[in-house]
Every structure is written in structure tokens, then in C-alpha cells.
Amino acid sequence: TSVKENYKEELAHVKEWIDKRNFYAIGEIGIDLYWDKSYLKEQQEAFRTQIQWAKEKKLPIVIHCREAFDEIFEILESEKDPDLFGVFHCFTGTLEQAKKAIGLGFMLGIGGVVTFKNGGIDKYINQIGIQNIVLETDSPYLSPMPYRGKRNESSYITHVISKLSNLYNKSELEIASLTTKNALKIFNL
């Protein structure tokens, strides 16, 4: 999602690798308007290009979306296809955005933010079927409570599981099992 003037060269380099080896997904790809909006057009073009590669290879995409839900959804709707699916990485949107993402064939990647006091997604996530959720760490960022502000690590995923267990009124083992099945399915493992 970091795009500069030489983004076409960078894309060509990525394409070389995609054609050389087998991968389980294409990503993180997407649009990030948090720091800088000046390269929006280039980000949109790069996103579309990488979506095309994913559709050709029948691979899921992992979407990076920061301050860009409208722009991402516009592209996903125009590229809609049974071969376009994947995960909204580190999902932090609204309930309506969650439903829209799922309607477009995507799962929601849920990590440490669900444990934050003002993260927001804990207010509605249990209205989203667990079959639409995969777990993530976003390591080294976005550590769950009680480690917020510290370097994230994979072992902290248990705190995300614990929070989801409370929100869904299911055992931690059940949350872990169901979300693992979702990940295995989406990445064809």
C-alpha cells in the first residue's frame, strides 16, 4: 500500500515472483489514505492490478484498508467476481462496512483492536456470524489488552480469542477451532 512514482516497477517485480512460485494469497494490498492522499490514483491502479492477478490465480487477497473503505468498496464492486475473495486485514470498520465486506465475499480479520476499550468493533462483532471471521495478530502492532502499546507477538492471540469467547458466548476452544477452520478454508489449506 506504499505507492511512489516507481510503483509500476515495483508491481513488475511482484508479478515476476507471483509467476515464479506458488503462493497462498496476494497481499497485503489495498489503499491507505491515513498519512497521504496524494497517491490515491496510483494506489487504486496498483490495487486493481493485484486484484487481477489474484483472480487469474484464483488466490484470496488480503486487504489493507486505512481511511479508505469507500475507495476500496468501489473497486471491489467493479471487480466483483466469484474468483475475488479474501480477508479484510485488521478490520476496524462499522457494522455496515463489515456486512458490505462479507457481502462482497470477504472475511474479517480480527485482532487486538477487539480488546480495546474504545476500539468499537466489540460493540457489534457478535452480530457477525463467526463463519466470517479469521484471527490475526498484526504483529508487531496493535497488541491486545493488557499489552496495548507494547510489541505484539503471536502468543497474544489468546487474548483476542478470550474476548471473542465472551462476545459470542462460546468457549475459547470453539472460537479457536471455528476461526482456524475459516482460515484453512480461505487460504485453501
Residue positions per predicted region:
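Mid-domain alpha/beta scaffold segments of enzyme catalytic cores
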Residues: T1-L189
